[in-house]
């Protein structure tokens, strides 16, 4: 009995399943939320009822899958709104409220998808109907238009209809759209012509009403001419305005046009501290380096300045310190740059082509009138005459980047004056603040002085040590200063001539000494014996010889006895006398005898230089 009952229950479920499924499909998945509830209730039943429900469920699932092959949503989700067994197991673990919410969301998503499909089908039908209507209107327009088709209208109409039917059948959507646009343009032109005709008629009627209909041909001609001129002026005025707008708003397409708004590094340095720097620079173009190319040269690009910002680091620009950086744009990219990387060279054609391509791609190409305006701004900024207020602002701007003042004395004097004024006003707090600033300036000055003398501190220490050592030796008596009586060739001497005055005997002695060098005799004593006892003449005679006028004009050799000491070498032969000619000079013994001789010897020797001279 149990088997028969189960079989009968299976048959009943099979009969009921198609009816319920058909009614459910008409109502867009109406009973589907009931299915998981039935499964939930079946899960809560006894174990005896479970084996009876499983085969019926499998059969209903297969039937529903076969019926649901037409819809695109049922490919991934089955009738129970589950993708696979894991999804179903996950759903079973949820609470009742979460289960209902999950089922509702899945049903809503399926309904939305079905609604989208229906809307898409309706739109496709409407597009098809509109295309058919467009074809019919074209046929009617061609059939109504006369002219050259009057010869054989039936044949041409039939051939046109056949070709139009074929074109309508094989015509894609873009061709149909072009035809629609063309028809719309023709309709607009016809409407404009009709409006112009109506306006002309209305103007003519108004003139007739004012001046009368029988005013003559002149009035009619003048009215027609006025209407024509007014209509022509109306037609020409917007064209002229548009042409002017086109000329004014012409885009930059040449390198010469872009060069008008170019800024170099030198121009930027001229107005870096000016109060109008930001407004002048924004909108101009600069040439910036982008590193090395594959070859030997550097890579440069053209950038547009879109803003000015301040950075934390201070750098130098043409000898001027600043912390300003420029925000530049090239196509769709923006980057901040220091102005020290801006090139002084002009733009090149390759760089301009790259910049033009990037601007066209991103749609930010400038116009010629903007270039002219920026050129005027640059010239105005460079040739600007600064007022006292602007100069004060520039000085403040420069002082921001100076950590140490240049002129310590001047700054200290200014602070001292302000301190005195504060004390006179009785503002003790301000006077104390100024005093701290003065102390800071003095400290900075001392540090700079130490840095300057740091390189020469070692040499200064050595010099100071040597001076102190010599001073101690002189004071203690260890060091004695000896005066050298002999002439030192390395000491400086006075080169000026001095007038020598003295007795006649001294002058005669000097003359005899000078004449003895010229008159040299052949005889003499032994050279070795004469050189053994050299005597040095007194310093007074040497001074007289040098200062004597006659000795200055003597071209003969002046024997220096001090130097003969060094070159003297005693000979081995005892009594051999050298054979000296009279032209080479006399021996030392003869020279001594003549020096020690009386007035007769002096007079005899003094005759020689007079004859020689």
From Swiss-Prot:
SUPFAM superfamilies: Plus3-like (SSF159042). Residues 167-176, 236-247 have a biased composition (Basic and acidic residues). Its main location: nucleus. Residues 55-68 have a biased composition (Basic residues). GO terms for molecular function: DNA binding; RNA polymerase II C-terminal domain phosphoserine binding. The keyword tRNA-binding does not apply. This is RNA polymerase-associated protein RTF1 homolog.
């Amino acid at each position: 009995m149990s088997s028969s009952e189960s079989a009968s229950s299976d048959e009943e479920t099979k009969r009921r399943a198609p009816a319920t499924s058909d009614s459910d499909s008409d109502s867009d998945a109406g009973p589907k939320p009931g299915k998981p509830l039935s499964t939930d209730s079946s899960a809560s039943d006894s174990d005896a009822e479970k084996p009876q429900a499983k085969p019926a469920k499998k059969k209903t699932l297969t039937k529903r899958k076969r019926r649901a092959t037409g819809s695109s949503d049922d490919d991934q989700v089955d009738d129970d709104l589950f993708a696979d067994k894991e999804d179903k197991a996950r759903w079973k673990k949820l609470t009742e409220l979460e289960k209902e919410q999950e089922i509702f969301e899945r049903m809503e998503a399926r309904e939305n998808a079905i609604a989208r499909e229906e809307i898409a089908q309706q739109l496709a039908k409407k597009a098809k109907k509109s295309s058919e209507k467009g074809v019919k209107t074209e046929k009617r327009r061609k059939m109504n238009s006369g002219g050259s088709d009057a010869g054989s209208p039936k044949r041409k109409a039939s051939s046109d209809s056949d070709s139009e039917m074929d074109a309508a059948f094989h015509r894609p959507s873009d061709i149909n759209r072009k035809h629609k646009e063309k028809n719309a343009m023709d309709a607009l032109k016809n409407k404009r012509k009709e409006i112009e005709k109506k306006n002309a008629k209305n103007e003519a009627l108004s003139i007739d009403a004012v001046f009368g209909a029988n005013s003559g041909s002149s009035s009619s001609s003048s009215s027609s001419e006025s209407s024509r001129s007014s209509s022509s002026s109306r037609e020409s005025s917007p064209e002229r305005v548009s042409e002017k707008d086109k000329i004014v708003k012409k885009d930059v397409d040449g390198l010469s046009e872009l060069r008008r708004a170019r800024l170099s590094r030198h121009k930027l340095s001229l107005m870096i501290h000016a109060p109008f720097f930001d407004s002048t620079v924004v909108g101009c173009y600069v040439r910036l380096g982008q590193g090395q190319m594959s070859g030997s040269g550097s890579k440069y690009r053209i950038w547009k300045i879109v803003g000015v910002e301040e950075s934390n680091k201070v750098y130098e620009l043409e000898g001027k310190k600043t912390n300003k950086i420029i925000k530049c744009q090239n196509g769709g990219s923006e980057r901040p740059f220091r102005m020290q990387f801006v090139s002084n060279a002009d733009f090149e054609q390759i760089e301009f082509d790259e910049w033009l391509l990037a601007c066209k791609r991103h749609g930010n190409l400038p116009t010629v009138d903007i270039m002219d305006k920026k050129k005027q701004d640059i010239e105005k900024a460079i040739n600007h005459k600064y007022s006292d207020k602007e100069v004060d602002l520039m000085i403040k701007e420069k002082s921001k980047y100076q950590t140490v003042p240049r002129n310590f004395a001047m700054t200290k004097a200014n602070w001292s004056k302000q301190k005195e004024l504060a004390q006179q006003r009785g503002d003790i707090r301000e006077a104390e603040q100024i005093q701290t600033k003065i102390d800071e300036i003095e400290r900075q000055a001392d540090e700079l002085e130490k840095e300057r003398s740091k390189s020469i501190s070692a040499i200064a220490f050595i010099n100071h040590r040597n001076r102190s050592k010599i001073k101690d030796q002189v004071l203690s008596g260890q060091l004695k200063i000896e005066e050298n009586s002999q002439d030192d060739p390395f000491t400086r001497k006075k080169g000026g001539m001095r007038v020598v005055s003295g007795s006649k005997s001294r002058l005669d002695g000097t003359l005899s000494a000078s004449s003895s060098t010229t008159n040299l005799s052949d005889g003499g004593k032994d050279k070795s014996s004469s050189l053994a006892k050299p005597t040095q003449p007194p310093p007074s005679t040497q001074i007289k010889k040098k200062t004597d006028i006659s000795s200055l004009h003597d071209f003969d050799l002046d024997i220096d006895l001090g130097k003969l000491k060094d070159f003297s070498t005693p000979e081995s032969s005892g009594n051999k006398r050298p054979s000296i000619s009279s032209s080479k000079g006399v021996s030392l013994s003869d020279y001594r005898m003549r020096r020690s001789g009386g007035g007769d010897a002096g007079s005899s020797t003094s005759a020689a230089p007079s004859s020689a001279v």
